[in-house]
A protein has these predicted regions:
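Rossmann-like adenosine-cofactor binding region
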Residues: 44-47, 60-65, 179-275
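Rossmann-like dinucleotide-binding domain for NAD(H)/NADP(H)
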Residues: 98, 231-321
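Short beta->alpha connector loops
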Residues: 11-13, 34-38, 56-60, 79-82, ...
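Glycine-rich NAD(P)-binding loop of Rossmann-like domains
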Residues: 104, 128-162, 171
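Phosphate-coordination loops involved in phosphoryl transfer and adenosine-cofactor binding
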Residues: 2, 72, 147-150, 222, ...
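Phosphate/diphosphate ligand-binding glycine-rich loop within oxidoreductases
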Residues: 48-128, 143
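N-terminal glycine-/charge-rich "phosphate-binding" loop or analogous flexible N-terminal tail
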Residues: 1-51, 55-56, 171, 184, ...
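Oxidoreductase and adenylate-handling cofactor-binding alpha/beta cores
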Residues: 110-129, 165-172, 302-309, 314
Length: 321
């Protein structure tokens, strides 16, 4: 009997575009979905799957769903972490799990961070609208510059460090905080280590680059957002759980902060009536931080490699520990 492989959430139509599936399709039936599936529609789609390919953590795979997939033999996900996958439930059924490599996603996310900073700081959406409405410059075209401003980085890993280097090139001061930050580590990239409260009080732009965990959930709540300058901008290309979304919406609507650029959301795709769609001075992107051709080339080729090995009865490639 031919195996059935289901590929979920290929929004970008990238799998077949960026890799060769001919050997897999010769040995198995493959169905690729480019729109999200939910509830009974998702269950009906997955019921006959022998192998399942997940794009990051776009579709949750909890134990309650896994228990209903009696034919499931193998799971592959892109990237190296999947917070929406119940790995324990799969391992309990001895279903192997593979993952791909990342590719240059940190470069992509750092670039997007700066695109959002500059887009919001220079009010590029509003300036573009002037021209599409047959207008020219107005009072909102008198724009600030970055030199001499302070960038606050919450987290200074590989992405945060890249963002810091660009800020210094613009002549900005960089301050940073994380639970394990040391003055020496901050100094190594030309930044100053401060407390979280000091960072929020001092920064003209605050950008999040910290790992999501139980201790960082809701890190920026109503109390913390109230510490920010009234014209300060908040940038989040990390994880939505780091910020209390309701508190952010209130802060934007009440104009207690200057604006926000957001790439990550509590539920994705973003629902049509989400309040962030209507908040002032808000720039939204559809979770593009890791969405770059070199990254997806690594994803798709890794998936093909894993599936070919599985179909040929070879040892699992890049098994999840």
């Amino acid at each position: 009997m031919r195996k059935k492989i289901i590929v979920l959430d290929d929004y970008e139509n990238s799998y077949e575009k960026l890799s060769d599936w001919s050997k897999i399709k010769a040995a198995a039936d493959v169905e690729i979905f480019n729109q999200p599936l939910y509830g009974q529609e998702l269950l009906k789609t997955l019921e006959k799957a022998h192998a399942l390919v997940l794009m990051r953590d776009r579709t949750p795979l909890p134990a309650s769903l896994i228990d209903q997939l009696s034919h499931l033999e193998y799971v592959v996900f892109t990237g190296t972490r999947n917070l929406a996958l119940d790995a324990a439930a799969l391992k309990q059924r001895n279903i192997p799990i593979s993952h791909t490599e990342w590719g240059p996603s940190k470069d992509s996310t750092a670039e997007l961070t700066w695109a959002l900073i500059l887009g919001l700081h220079k009010r590029l959406v509003e300036q573009n609208q002037l021209l599409t409405q047959q207008a020219w410059r107005n009072e909102h075209s008198l724009l600030p510059v970055l030199k001499g401003r302070t960038l606050g980085l919450i987290g200074l890993g590989e992405i945060g460090s890249r963002v810091a280097k660009v800020a210094l090139a613009f002549g900005m001061k960089v301050v940073t905080w994380s639970p394990n930050m040391t003055p020496a580590r901050a100094d190594a990239v030309g930044a100053e280590s401060v407390s979280l409260d000091e960072l929020l009080q001092q920064s003209d732009i605050v950008s999040l680059h910290i790992v999501a965990s139980a201790t960082t959930k809701g890190l920026l709540n109503q109390e913390k957002l109230a510490l920010m300058k009234k014209d300060a901008l908040l940038i989040n290309t990390s994880r939505s759980t780091l910020v209390d979304t309701h508190a952010l919406v209130v802060a934007l609507n009440d104009r207690t902060i200057g604006g926000a650029a957001i790439d990550v959301f509590d539920a994705e795709p973003l629902v049509a009536d989400h309040p962030l769609r209507n908040t002032p001075n808000t720039l939204l992107t559809p979770h593009l931080g890791f969405v770059a051709q070199p990254v997806f080339e690594s994803f798709t080729k890794g998936v093909v490699e894993c599936l070919e090995a599985w179909l040929n009865g070879q040892p699992v490639i890049r098994p999840l520990p």
